[in-house]
């Protein structure tokens, strides 16, 4: 059976389909719907404070008794200068003026937020914890394992996958360059982040690690799931496929933009957050490209542009806000999450029946 393997057993799920923990875009209904359909729903906790995460976990538990996960951001060890911030504020001034916004006071609470997330995940006995942007400390991994929480890391290269396995991850997401949203990269060979496609990355990681590999990037339907399994993955993680679902927290602006875009419309940019992320190209990205080498690292840039993005989204201006999307938008639907999962399963079974 295509849906019975080490990953499904480890995560206590029926189908090896994981809904990506997209920060700011998941809802309890989305998470629970995927879990109730036999997959693994994941809370995107990246921007939550402690109370928000606790409330989200409690709400999900009201909607499902099945396994689910929480995705957290590992704090970045980045450096920045005051002149970088001053310059960026000057460059962003016209956008703020147009939207009647004040210059924000930057508050960096990454470390404290991450610590609180881990404490909450342990306290609430969340079954699965997923990491993006790196690998947590040995002590944090030990605490989570002692609480019998399964750990999933993210890798965009073979070296990152090896590092995840050595650190004690139970499974690894192999994030191909087709994936929408932030790149999970944390190692920089020759100071350049990896941009390896899913079909190339997955088998190369599978060949060098002993733990289950989860394919991610451009996977939208049963064909992509089955292809990933053929490549050696034991499961898939899907983001954009669920982002356009009726059950996600995506705005109608973003949902419509993805549904109406083409495979050639996305770019990878640091303009919005200071970390590379794939989204639909727009005026803000193009105008900020001239400052590409001077953009402060995450989370500074994320803080500096946050109010601009929110204000633009509120007035329906897709040219000044982030529009995260993978490279397979033509395959996106607005179906409820449970329908998306059942369609994937039916398509796989149909393909296997005729092979």
Curated annotation (Swiss-Prot):
Q: Which cofactor does it need?
A: FMN
Q: Which GO molecular function entries does the Swiss-Prot or TrEMBL record give?
A: nitronate monooxygenase activity; nucleotide binding
Details of cofactor binding: Binds 1 FMN per subunit.
Q: Which domain of life is it from?
A: Bacteria
SUPFAM superfamilies per the record? Inosine monophosphate dehydrogenase (IMPDH)
Residues binding FMN? 71, 175, 180, 218, 237-240
List the disulfide bonds in this chain.
Answer: none
Top EC category: oxidoreductase
Task: Report if keyword Oxidoreductase is assigned.
Answer: yes
Mind listing the UniProt keywords for this protein, alphabetically? Detoxification, Flavoprotein, FMN, Monooxygenase, Nucleotide-binding, Oxidoreductase
Q: What is its EC number?
A: 1.13.12.-
Q: Which Pfam families does the record associate with it?
A: NMO
InterPro entries associated with the record: Aldolase_TIM, NMO
A biological process from GO: response to toxic substance
Q: Which reaction does it catalyse?
A: 3 propionate 3-nitronate + 3 O2 + H2O = 3 3-oxopropanoate + 2 nitrate + nitrite + H2O2 + 3 H(+)
Q: What does this protein do?
A: Nitronate monooxygenase that uses molecular oxygen to catalyze the oxidative denitrification of alkyl nitronates. Acts on propionate 3-nitronate (P3N), the presumed physiological substrate. Probably functions in the detoxification of P3N, a metabolic poison produced by plants and fungi as a defense mechanism.
General remark: P3N is a potent irreversible inhibitor of the key enzyme succinate dehydrogenase in the Krebs cycle and electron transport chain. P3N has been shown to be a toxic metabolite to bacteria, plants, fungi, mammals or any organism that uses succinate dehydrogenase.
Q: Which family does it belong to?
A: Belongs to the nitronate monooxygenase family. NMO class I subfamily.
The protein depicted here goes by the name Probable nitronate monooxygenase
């Amino acid at each position: 059976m295509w849906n019975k393997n080490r990953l499904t057993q480890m995560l206590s799920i029926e189908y090896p389909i994981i809904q990506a923990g997209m920060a700011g875009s998941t809802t309890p209904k989305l998470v629970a719907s995927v879990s109730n359909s036999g997959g693994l729903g994941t809370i995107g906790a990246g921007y939550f404070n402690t109370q928000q995460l606790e409330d989200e976990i409690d709400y999900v538990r009201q909607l499902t008794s099945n396994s689910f996960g929480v995705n957290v951001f590992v704090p970045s060890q980045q450096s920045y200068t005051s002149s970088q911030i001053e310059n960026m504020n000057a460059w962003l001034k016209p956008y703020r003026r147009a939207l009647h916004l004040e210059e924000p006071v930057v508050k960096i609470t990454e470390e404290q937020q991450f610590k609180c997330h881990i404490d909450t995940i342990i306290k609430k006995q969340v079954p699965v914890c997923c990491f993006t942007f790196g690998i947590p400390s040995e002590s944090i991994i030990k605490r989570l394992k002692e609480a019998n929480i399964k750990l999933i890391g993210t890798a965009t290269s073979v070296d990152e996958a090896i590092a995840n396995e050595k650190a004690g991850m139970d499974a690894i997401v192999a994030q191909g360059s087709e994936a929408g949203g932030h790149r999970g990269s944390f190692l920089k060979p020759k100071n350049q982040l990896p941009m390896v496609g899913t079909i190339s990355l997955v088998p190369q990681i599978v060949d060098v690690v002993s733990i289950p590999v989860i394919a991610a990037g451009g996977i939208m339907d049963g064909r992509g799931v089955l292809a990933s399994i053929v490549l050696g993955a034991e499961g898939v993680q899907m983001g954009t496929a669920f982002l356009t679902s009726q059950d996600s927290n995506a705005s109608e602006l973003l949902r419509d933009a993805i549904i109406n875009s083409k495979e050639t419309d996305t770019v990878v940019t640091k303009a919005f957050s200071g970390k590379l992320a794939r989204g639909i190209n727009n005026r803000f990205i193009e105008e900020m490209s001239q400052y590409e080498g001077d953009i402060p690292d995450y989370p500074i840039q994320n803080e500096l542009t946050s109010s601009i993005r929110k204000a633009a989204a509120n007035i329906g201006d897709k040219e000044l806000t982030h529009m995260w999307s993978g490279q397979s938008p033509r395959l996106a639907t607005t179906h409820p999450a449970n329908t998306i999962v059942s369609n994937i399963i039916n398509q796989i079974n149909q393909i296997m029946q005729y092979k």
